[in-house]
Amino acid sequence: MAQADFVSPTSIDVSEKKEVEFHKKVDHVENPPLSTESAKLEAEEVAAEKLNSEHLLENEFAPITDPTHRRVSKNPDGAELFQFEDEPSYYYVVATYLTYLVLIIIGHVRDFFGKRFHKDDYKYLKDNDGYAPLYNHFDNFYVRRLQHRINDCFSRPTMGVPGRVIRLMNRYSTDSNSTFKLTGDTSLALNVSSYNYLGFAQSHGPCATKVEEAMQKYGLSTCSSNAICGTYGLHKEVEELTANFVGKPAALVFSQGFSTNATVFSTLMCPGSLIISDELNHTSIRFGARLSGANIRVYKHNDMTDLERVLREVISQGQPRTHRPYSKILVVIEGLYSMEGNFCDLPKVVELKNRYKFYLFIDEAHSIGAIGPRGGGICDYFGISTDHVDILMGTFTKSFGAAGGYISATPNIINKLRVTNPGYVYAESMSPAVLAQIKSSFLEIMDNSPTSAGLERIERLAFNSRYIRLGLKRLGFIIFGNDDSPVVPLLLYNPGKINAFSHEMLKRGIAVVVVGYPACPLLTSRVRFCFSASHNKADMDYFLRACDEVGEKLQLKFSTGAAGEDVGKTNVEKMKKNQGWFKPPRWKIEDVLKHGVHDALTQ
């Protein structure tokens, strides 16, 4: 097995103590004293520790095992955005609703008896000494009686770099998941849950070196807001790099991605204006839109027909009651929807923009750096000029391995935000160390040379996304999203399988993120995989084998098989499928791995 192959996580255990000792000794060994026996032994010891350090680097970012495992992420010229929508049989849908019904009934029965025999446990839900409860019984029901059952799957503490593998801090509960205690030991697992799309979150390498240099020069914090004395030269450099990269004339950086969306709309919009939002836009967008005081309309997710219907209605009818025209209309969409794994239909949105003359705001938190031939986001993916987009928003948390967010637009908009946006004027400015990480990541990505490490990461991510998606579909799972998306939602449906899937994958040394209501619709509980450029084919093969085993064990292969491209080869098969008594084909795992590379590169 190659050195970078992912074996069992229990067999990978790099000692942190040895790593620290290695860094203490390395300067001494580079300039050794007289050639004595002790010096030779010390040099041999450091050489061995250096191998351990190199192994640590491979745990964070695996070297590519085959130079052909790269792909350009772009939409074929003239091709319409297409996503095959698969659904389970009615049996699984009914079973899911019945499961929720049983859980709700049991929860109410427990509450009925609990309020009478364990009154102290319900004090916080009732008036207490003149104080009203902060939340009532109904609002708290889901958390107490449903989410509480699978609480051990969420917010698992970790340590170290969220790279190719991640170290989990083991814990246990003695009070039915109300609280957790750490055991003191850790487990190493393949990481398919972090947003580290391009693998820039590393403890070693050019980015880490620049971060260390920035900390030594500037310290850890600016201790001020941008409006006072918290703007360094690094802030200006990163803003200029951001604007150049996304293709807009100016940019503004914020210390947090969530607050970027939460505060930007109150600066741009006002009462009498209108925000039209996709129904699955991120919470930060919804929060910011409500703060703005503008009217808000929602259209069906990625449904351009419904968006046009809303546009025609609001333009013709105007504001409620007065019917006066809206002062301005802003359509807000995301480049890549983080829970669905699909792209916005940007070509059709731009077509509607040219027809109905609204302003366009795109949240590229997950798409910037992750898609497009040069990682330029959704506009780069479709080959559409950013001139068609009025405001581009994004975060540095995902592809850049840092923190914070940005707004990129015309100088007039940026200058207005610079003096009126509360998230910029009053909040702490971005840390110099974070700025150094962003700057070094940008320079890697923007290097257009044939041997560019940044370009390799972008193309590795595109290949990995295709390879995993195709493999899971052929195994029989229902997968949401577009084929080039690095966000891969696998549908579980039944809430009882959320906990089971998480634990079964963890037994096989794989850390996953499971998602349930209210983060997603009640019926479509899911697990969300986020692959990165740090994974190689051995990692993905190990992952697919584990999914195949767990999928069989938990009966998760609901797909019709159409997405796996092996349904309806003959008219008889098509007829059987349409009549509902056709058994979907399932690829064997050996065939999936055998044909996966070729098909991921050619389809």
From Swiss-Prot:
Which ranges does the record mark as transmembrane? 90-107
Query: According to its UniProt record, in which pathway does this protein act?
Result: Lipid metabolism; sphingolipid metabolism
> Which top-level group of life is the source organism from?
Eukaryota
**Where in the cell?**
Cytoplasm; Endoplasmic reticulum; Membrane
UniProt keyword list: Acyltransferase, Cytoplasm, Endoplasmic reticulum, Lipid metabolism, Membrane, Pyridoxal phosphate, Sphingolipid metabolism, Transferase, Transmembrane, Transmembrane helix
- UniProt EC number: 2.3.1.50
Q: May I have one GO cellular component term?
A: serine palmitoyltransferase complex
Supply the InterPro entries for this chain: Aminotrans_II_pyridoxalP_BS (IPR001917), Aminotransferase_I/II_large (IPR004839), AON_synthase_class-II (IPR050087), PyrdxlP-dep_Trfase (IPR015424), PyrdxlP-dep_Trfase_major (IPR015421), PyrdxlP-dep_Trfase_small (IPR015422)
Which biological process annotations from GO are given for this protein? ceramide biosynthetic process; sphingosine biosynthetic process
Check the UniProt entry and state the signal peptide residues, or none: none
What is its cofactor?
Answer: pyridoxal 5'-phosphate
Q: Which Pfam families match?
A: Aminotran_1_2
Instruction: Report the catalytic activity.
Output: L-serine + hexadecanoyl-CoA + H(+) = 3-oxosphinganine + CO2 + CoA
Top-level class of the enzyme under EC nomenclature: transferase
Q: What CDD domains does its record include?
A: KBL_like
Query: Acyltransferase as a keyword?
Result: yes
Q: Which residues carry this modification: N6-(pyridoxal phosphate)lysine?
A: 398
Give the bilayer topology. Answer: Single-pass membrane protein
**A GO molecular-function term, please?**
serine C-palmitoyltransferase activity
Q: How does it assemble?
A: Lcb1 and lcb2 encode essential subunits of the enzyme and form a heterodimer.
Main function:
Catalytic subunit of serine palmitoyltransferase (SPT), which catalyzes the committed step in the synthesis of sphingolipids, the condensation of serine with palmitoyl CoA to form the long chain base 3-ketosphinganine.
Q: Please state which protein family the record places this protein in.
A: Belongs to the class-II pyridoxal-phosphate-dependent aminotransferase family.
Protein name in the entry? Serine palmitoyltransferase 2
Organism of derivation: Schizosaccharomyces pombe (strain 972 / ATCC 24843) (Fission yeast)
